[in-house]
Amino acid sequence: MRIFLTAVFALLFIVPNIQAGKVQIPEDTEVKVKFDPGMKISSKLLQPGIPLLIYLAEPVEIGGKVIIEEGAMGKAEVLEVKGASKPGKPGYLKVAFVDIKPKGEYNTLDSAAIKLKGEVESEGGGKKLLSWLFIFGLFIKGGEATLPSDAIYTVQIGETVRLSND
């Protein structure tokens, strides 16, 4: 009788937890993100601290179940920018991926965004040799740094996060 009561008591706590649909995404899980395709990301146009809109490029799945749907919106931030300058110095751009807001059936327990970690950088083409070959080359600027907005970038989840479909 005692074993039966223990089993019934255990089931009372296990069954609601299974039905609740709680999942955990471990830190360093790779996810794929992309920028808004209409956005021009260039060292000529941006300044440090400016937020950029990103989207989840592929759904996050655990055990064959979609936890975060494709298209979930998030944020990246411009960390460093150096515009192209004379004589022939290239531009530089560094962007950090900040977070992504869950989309779909599951949400974080406190409805917070999921932290991301990862950075991408770009350097424009230099024209220094050309600038020294000709006297007028001193007036030639280097190329601006750009990031393709149609590319897919692999980043990681910044910390272990628990989600629920309650």
Where are these regions (language model features)?
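Contiguous beta-sheet cores, especially beta-hairpins with glycine/small-residue-rich turns
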Residues: G21-D166
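Bacterial N-terminal signal peptides
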Residues: T6-P16
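Bacterial N-terminal signal peptides that target proteins for export
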Residues: M1-L5
